């Protein structure tokens, strides 16, 4: 099981500036961190136009991602990388690689990085809450990025256990900052199909691809294990502050798909008030996570009852709740 690992940050600079001298692409490679997430800002958040941060890729138990920004060719930019799990903050300034004046850059116009490999396809699972509540609709999503303006037409075919299905919705393509398109197809699925481990396949056709790309996803294989849920009061050391933390510890569950939310005196709490860690693999292959609810100390002192609700497929009726409040005295 992977330990918390801080990322390394490397600048990515084009080796030549386009001779019109207008725009160029700079980037930062954030490599070898665990767990998710990291945040990447440019110029401390002042630079938002022309930014494209790609999804993280998991390799050998560690995540990596790339963030790119398009700026005027005379400009440098600083990427600000934060990895909360390891309390790491790294600022890396990226500037174009200058060639000596007597020998100006004579390489052909730098191809934009998105065109090197053509379109890429990613498939995403349904949200755990959607698969566990009959009143909600679980959806598998297929996303195609780096679709060129020359070949913008994208077709999707969906399969459930290799049988074609026709109820997907393809959304209108969206133009990205770098003049490529992003296209998304969403397949509503049956709760039981996901929970029983059926395979969902998205097949993508585009003339810029030498052959269709297929991506498959299914629930993690293995025997489900029921989570144990414990609520923890604020630490005595924290009670001198105006805000205190009520914690929900959820352990011993498998697979990692889980949903946690809170209520205060039976009223649902806004998601802004609590933070969940990602599920973390434990030594025995099960998962655990913490959920931290921040509350006013005055509300805690008044005996407000806080309830941690956990949804997981191994639970009876897919849900369990644990309540906590200040003990009298």
Swiss-Prot record:
Pfam families: C1-set. The keyword Hydrolase does not apply. It comes from the Eukaryota. It is found in: Secreted. Disulfide bonds join 28-79, 142-202, 248-308. CDD domains: IgC1_CH1_IgEG (cd21817), IgC1_CH3_IgAGD_CH4_IgAEM (cd05768). Glycans are attached at residue 178. InterPro entries: Ig-like_dom, Ig-like_dom_sf, Ig-like_fold, Ig/MHC_CS, Ig_C1-set, Immune_Resp_Modulators. Keywords: Disulfide bond, Glycoprotein, Immunoglobulin domain, Secreted. GO terms for cellular component: extracellular region. This chain was isolated from pooled serum of strain 13 inbred guinea pigs. This is Ig gamma-2 chain C region.
């Amino acid at each position: 099981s992977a330990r918390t690992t801080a990322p390394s940050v490397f600048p990515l600079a084009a080796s030549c500036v386009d001779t019109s001298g207008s725009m160029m692409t700079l980037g930062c490679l954030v490599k070898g961190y665990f767990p998710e997430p990291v945040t990447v800002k440019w110029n401390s958040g002042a630079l938002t136009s022309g930014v494209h941060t790609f999804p993280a890729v998991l390799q050998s138990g560690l995540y990596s991602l790339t963030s790119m920004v398009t700026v005027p060719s005379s400009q440098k930019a600083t990427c600000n990388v934060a990895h909360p799990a390891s309390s790491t903050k790294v600022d890396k300034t990226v500037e174009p690689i200058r060639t000596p004046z007597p020998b100006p850059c004579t390489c052909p116009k730098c191809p934009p990085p998105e065109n090197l490999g053509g379109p890429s396809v990613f498939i995403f699972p349904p949200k755990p809450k959607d698969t566990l509540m009959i009143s909600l609709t679980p959806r598998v999503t297929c996303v195609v990025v780096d679709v060129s303006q020359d070949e913008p037409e994208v077709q999707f075919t969906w399969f459930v256990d290799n049988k074609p299905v026709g109820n997907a919705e393809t959304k209108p393509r969206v133009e990205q900052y770098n003049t490529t398109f992003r296209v998304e197809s969403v397949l509503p699925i049956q709760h039981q199909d996901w929970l029983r481990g059926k395979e969902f396949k998205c097949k993508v056709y585009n003339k810029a691809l030498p052959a269709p790309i297929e991506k498959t996803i299914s629930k993690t294989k293995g025997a489900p294990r029921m989570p144990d849920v414990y609520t923890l009061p604020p630490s005595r050391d924290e009670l001198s502050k105006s805000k205190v933390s009520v914690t929900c510890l959820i352990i011993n569950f498998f697979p990692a798909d889980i949903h946690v939310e809170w209520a205060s005196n039976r009223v649902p709490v806004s998601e802004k008030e609590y933070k969940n860690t990602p599920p973390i693999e434990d030594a025995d292959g099960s998962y655990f996570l913490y959920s931290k609810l921040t509350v006013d100390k005055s509300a805690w002192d008044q005996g407000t009852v806080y309830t941690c609700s956990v949804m997981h497929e191994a639970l009876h009726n897919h849900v369990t709740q644990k309540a906590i409040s200040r003990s009298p005295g």
